[in-house]
């Protein structure tokens, strides 16, 4: 059985993925933003291998999450599930970053760099990533007028590009990105067409399955099928520039092979 860490596992797709993997007999490490949010996990906590607490909008707390995970031990897979949708304003984290960028892009990048390297990495993206401008000149929205939809789309483009970059740089790790679709969660709303079980299925399959179809790297998935992502995501030059920018913003270097 595998050990899997899932960010943002108190509700929505993260909780559904945790429930599914626990039901399959796997060991799951849960994550909550705060102790108050952890209380919402209820009985899942007693079934889990561990619980880490930290707010991904804070670089300091993100580092703490990585430390907590490394203290538990090496993970077999990490599902980077946590994220926010459209924010009404740029906001500012304790470090001064745009909140959408910090939670959706900087946090998974930092955790990837700081957590002992697992065998599999899965990043939750969105079909909306294709609406990102693909510009790396103002990642942190310090010059542009705030556009919530564009900021979200760009953040989801970033994690697809990160998955492809890691597949190229870390050949011994299976790195993939997933579009779960428009799912009926608190974020997606009651009118979303995709049920939560369907929404969580691809990422949990990629995390633990020995099916040869799941043992691939550098792919973009939607409902167990591979799709083509935005052109920028597969461009090594874009990937390398992005990683350089993220290292500058976080002060964290991505380890080499």
Q: Where do the protein language model's features map onto the residues?
A:
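C-terminal helical subdomain
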Residues: 177, 193-244, 248, 252
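Conserved glycine-rich Rossmann-like NAD(P)H-binding loop of the short-chain dehydrogenase/reductase
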Residues: 24-40
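N-terminal Rossmann NAD(P)H-binding glycine-rich loop of SDR-like oxidoreductase domains
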Residues: 10, 18-19
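Catalytic loop of short-chain dehydrogenase/reductase
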Residues: 83-92, 98, 120-172, 179-192
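Conserved hydrophobic beta-strands of the Rossmann-like cofactor-binding core
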Residues: 3-6, 78-79
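Conserved Rossmann-fold cofactor-binding substructure of NAD(P)-dependent oxidoreductases
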Residues: 56-74
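Rossmann-fold cofactor-recognition segment
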Residues: 45-60
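Ankyrin-repeat alpha-helix packing hotspot
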Residues: 105-106
